[in-house]
Curated annotation (Swiss-Prot):
Name of the protein: Giant hemoglobin AI chain
Oligomer status and interactors: Giant hemoglobin is composed of four heme-containing chains (AI to AIV), and two linker chains (AV and AVI).
Xref: PROSITE patterns: GLOBIN
Gene3D superfamilies referenced in this protein's UniProt entry, alphabetically: Globins
Domain Globin: 2-41
A GO MF term: metal ion binding
Organism: Lamellibrachia sp. (Deep-sea giant tube worm)
Length: 41
């Protein structure tokens, strides 16, 4: 779907918040890949 400029900024800000640095970044990345492999092993 198409996103407006405000939606793009909001998503970018949310990703920056979640995928910032350190342990939170590692935990988030690991959770994403576990979900990917669970859906398509």
């Amino acid at each position: 779907t198409d996103c407006g400029m405000l939606q793009r900024i909001k998503v970018k800000q949310q990703w920056a918040s979640v995928y910032s640095s350190g342990i939170a970044r590692e935990d988030f990345g690991e959770a994403i890949w576990k979900a990917v492999f669970a859906l398509a092993p």
